[in-house]
């Protein structure tokens, strides 16, 4: 995960990510609810291969190939229905949050959640996921866990060899398929319940602790 996992409480990338990740001697998959350019840019700035799961599993990039898994038609229709009921996604006319999204729509946490969920309830196969940073309106068939299976297959790595670290409900599907899973102390209840363990520290403090333990075990 990126937000809440490689960041500080204020949302900035923690400097320790640039110390710990560039030379990590195993594949690193950057998984996020953000649109595709964000994790690709992070991988590039860290000098890591572009192994990316974006939009909560809607876009996958592995071995130089990008696959768009989700269909944005139904999520976009839900947001239009939300607007029709008087709802406002809040982001404003420029809306850089959604500008590059290909499979889902993100709505601000300041928006009317109950109205948004009511609009989604009237659609087939659409879910609203609260990541703690936005409400993500997406297809029910899209998840980070399914995307990780796709990445693992492309890399020919057993799913049991993956260690997942995250902080919100959109990571529960990943925790269900990875060999080891850690919810950070700042994680929501869904992530905590799905993880194998919950760290005592929050944000990058917790992530750094997991990485230190993994390194110690490999020596």
Language-model-detected regions and their locations in the chain:
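Conserved acidic, metal-coordinating active-site core of Asp-based
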Residues: 85-178, 182, 186, 190-192
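Asp-based, Mg2+/Mn2+-dependent phosphohydrolase catalytic module
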Residues: 185-219
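Short glycine-/acidic-enriched loop or helix-start segments at secondary-structure transitions
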Residues: 9, 39-41, 63-64, 174, ...
């Amino acid at each position: 995960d990126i937000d809440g996992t490689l960041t500080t409480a204020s949302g900035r990338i923690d400097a320790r990510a640039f110390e710990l990740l560039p030379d990590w001697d195993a594949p690193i998959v950057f998984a996020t609810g953000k649109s595709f350019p964000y994790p690709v840019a992070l991988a590039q700035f860290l000098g890591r291969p572009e192994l990316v799961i974006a939009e909560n599993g809607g876009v996958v990039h592995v071995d130089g190939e990008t696959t768009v898994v989700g269909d944005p038609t139904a999520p976009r229709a839900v947001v239009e229905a939300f607007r029709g009921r008087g709802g406002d996604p809040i982001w404003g006319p420029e809306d850089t949050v959604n500008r590059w999204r290909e499979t889902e729509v993100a709505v601000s946490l300041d928006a009317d959640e109950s109205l948004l969920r009511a609009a989604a309830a009237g659609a087939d196969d659409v879910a609203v996921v609260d990541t703690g940073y936005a409400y993500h309106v997406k297809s029910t068939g899209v998840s980070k866990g399914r995307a990780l299976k796709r990445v693992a297959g492309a890399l020919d790595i057993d799913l049991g060899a993956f260690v997942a670290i995250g902080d919100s409900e959109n990571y529960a599907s990943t925790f269900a398929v990875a060999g080891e899973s850690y919810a950070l102390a700042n994680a929501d209840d869904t992530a905590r319940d799905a993880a194998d363990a919950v760290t005592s520290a929050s944000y990058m403090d917790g992530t750094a602790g997991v990485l230190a333990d993994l390194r110690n075990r490999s020596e």
